[in-house]
Amino acid sequence: DYSSLETKKLHAAAQIAQEGADKEIEEYLSKFTFPSDESKKLTKIALLNYCGAAILMPYKLFHTECKKLKYDLELLQNTFATSFEQVAHRVTCLQDPKLPGIPFHFLRVDMAGNISKRFSLSGIEIPRYGGACPRWNVYSALTRPGIIQAAVSKMSNGEKYVCIARTVE
């Protein structure tokens, strides 16, 4: 098995979530109409993975550490003994109106520019199909593995976003 320790921990936490919240998740999913059984199954997996991440990085504690560490993703990675990608994904979830975090967006992109994972709670519009804007620093990060690159992206509507990019192993 070639999975990293962090990936194994997330899978174990998702299994714990399934044991503890399977009934509630099934009940929640029953409120929606899915185009196929497969799409319902994938949605359930996504919810279980979300619960798994919440077990490893509980909301209040994670939010507190984000503020304390000024959203330094590598320090958060070390603090919670998780992967960089898991931390990057988790910061996008800090959207509780009672305890909000900074709005983040998240992309996972391969060497060919294909987007394989996307979350945008920052307001930035990420293409649903194809690749992201070729000027985004996500592509230049591929030329400098393991090094965080920061850039300010100015959109056509005048909105500005700070974008960080880094390769993950």
Where are the regions that the model predicts?
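Conserved binding/catalytic microenvironments
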Residues: D1-E169
